Amino acid sequence: MGPDNRRILLATVLSVGILILWQVIFPTKKVPPKPAPPPAAEVAKPAAPASPAPGAAAPAVPAPPPDAPEETVKLAGKGFEATLTTYGGALKSLRLEGDKFRKQEKDREVQIDLVHVTDGQPYPLSLSASPELGGAADVAADPGARAPMRIVAKDASSVTFEGRVGNLAARKTFRVTGKPYELALDVELSGGAGNGTVGVLYPAFMPPDTKSGGIFSGPPLDFVRPVCRAGTTTERFDLAKEGAPEKLEGQVSWAGVDQHYFVAAVLPAEPIGTCTFVRGPVKGAGLAALAVPVEGGARKLSLTVYAGPKDLDTLRGYGRGFESAIDYGAVAKFFALFARGLLYVMRWLEAIVRNWGVAIILLTVLVRLVLFPLTYKSMQSMNEMRKLQPEIEKLKAKFGDDREKMNLAVMQLYQKHKVNPLGGCLPMLLQMPVWFALYAALQTSVELYREPFLWMKDLTAHDPYFILPIAMGISSFVMQKLSPQPADNAQAKMMLYFFPGFFTVIMLFVPGGLTLYIFVNNLLSIVQQQLMMKHQQAAPAPAAGK
């Protein structure tokens, strides 16, 4: 195989790597099937107040609200404000505090709320008894989960509800613990008979037309999924799909809802019970149910509720595999360890310079320094190839259209002068794992969410004015221009124009932090190459030999 063909082969390999990166960044849009319209009789007929019989289908319309008027209580914790409701004695809203935890909603910015439910769904942390304990067979449509409870005690940091769950008396106390984004929940069940289970419910709703990822964007901030850690496996539940309930194997360490940079979950004191994902009662709705065994009609539970950002150190502090709430994706998960390493380095740099954009620039410099011995040898090889260009032109004139003989002669020329024609591609190959890892860090690390740099308001979002991608494309073109060109003119044009253009199009909608890294890396490569060319300019070109 000739040297030019080898360059094209390696370029093709790089293109495949870029295409893989494209698939990671821009996953295929999931288009859920259109829901079938409900029968006319069900639309006109009001919902019956009685619970559905065991084994009956889920109702197509939301259950009616409780008759008793709703009361709410607000608890202010460290970094959040929780609103608790008497409907189920549960969590109606949990808003994160601070300018960082805001999102754009239509024409205004609002605080991020980690509760996502729709009409007919229970609220997070409501309870549902199994049929053996007087509850409903379909937990997703159980009206008892929103049954009114009464407030029996409250102060600035706690509230206690009392009511019934199936045929059990229930007492639920929520307390602010003083830790960031944390509540404590104590549950006491009594007064029943027999054995069964009581589910601690964490529901979620996402409009069926929500994109899980499109051609030009990753998942939106409000892309939510019920999630559960059972045994040693963390599973996420796709609300866009239809199907029967899914029960996970193994005792449950935590269960809740995953929302991109955030997680809201309930953690028992120790692994217990089972976890089931259940769909309904409407399209796009579902829940994770932590089913806890109840024997003799009584049970006490001490639960921790965490609802906040996916800070790696914080999640690790809880143990129980809680750090697996950070989802690196199918491909990027192979770079998860590397991504965490990059994040720790960037956090250290940001603590010094107090700007995440500058920290990414300094990270680029550090990576270049680490890879300098390899990139130096690679650029030496490129410069040696450039010196041989006059001899290659002579070979092109000598052999004309006989490409096989020309490639053989060029390869012999490279061997004679100990030049590796593939050496120039080594720097990009070495950088690709860094790109994947940095992309994974940008997509999963809340530290970089809404962090500005220059004209960009958020380094985890794409450049709104496309300045960086275009600048990156120009710098890639300059790098190709400085590199030795293949002997074949068509191949030379493809290397010079196609790859920078193709790469620019891909980078238009990736996170600005990744584009910044690649742009700065290109600039450093250009400067290094220019300095080496000036340093070696005085050296005589190697003779072709006789």
From Swiss-Prot:
Its main location: membrane. Pfam families: 60KD_IMP, YidC_periplas. Keywords: Cell inner membrane, Cell membrane, Chaperone, Membrane, Protein transport, Transmembrane, Transmembrane helix, Transport. This is Membrane protein insertase YidC. GO terms for biological process: protein insertion into membrane; protein transport. Belongs to the OXA1/ALB3/YidC family. Type 1 subfamily. The chain crosses the membrane at residues 8-28, 326-346, 356-376, 422-442, 459-479, 498-518. GO terms for molecular function: membrane insertase activity. It is found in: Cell inner membrane. Residues 41-60 have a biased composition (Low complexity). One of its GO terms (cellular component) is plasma membrane. Required for the insertion and/or proper folding and/or complex formation of integral membrane proteins into the membrane. Involved in integration of membrane proteins that insert both dependently and independently of the Sec translocase complex, as well as at least some lipoproteins. Aids folding of multispanning membrane proteins. It comes from Anaeromyxobacter sp. (strain K).
